[in-house]
Amino acid sequence: MNRLEAERRFAQRMKETYPPGTRIVLLSMENDPRPIEDNTRGTVMTVDDIGTLHCDFDNGRSLGIVPGEDSFRRLTDEELAEEQDEDMDEDNAPVMGM
């Protein structure tokens, strides 16, 4: 298999593993001049043809994560359930009027 075919297969595997909407946590980003803070959660928006995960982070920033350079992982089922519980708590909070 040549290099281009290997890169194409890698990108396809990233697209299958991290479809749009996948929740991730960025563990570290070393080689960016303005890195996202460690342990910031985000949502995969798309994976491009070289396997970069383009994400919207919970801190309001958007940036590409480069597999092999940046350290990240999918949120566990337990972490996803905790996020849903937090969202439910916010939805059920009393509304304060003025």
Describe these PLM feature segments.
Residues 2-89:
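Basic/aromatic-rich interaction segments and small domains that mediate binding to polyanionic partners
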Residues 86-98:
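Non-Sec secretion/translocation targeting segments of pathogen effectors
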